[in-house]
């Protein structure tokens, strides 16, 4: 039997059973672009996530060739890079950028519960 890589991995970790109790699924991608919609891991995870559970993506950068979200089962995408930087600067600040993005997403979730 031939399976896609993401389906193999999700089966190995019993994803379908584990995701049932999730309130939110967060996927990651280095750079999200139109090619990401053609079978890369984030879309594979979104495809296997029940439709009642939102999926968001955290990515290094978002390319402008993507359609507006939601798309391919992903409700929203958040790039961690807020400005144009040289690669060495991006890599040097990755931890801080990821932390800041996660904090902003957490704040957005808290805010949504008060609306």
Regions found by a protein language model. Give the residues of each.
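N-terminal loops that bind phosphate or other acidic moieties
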Residues: 1-115
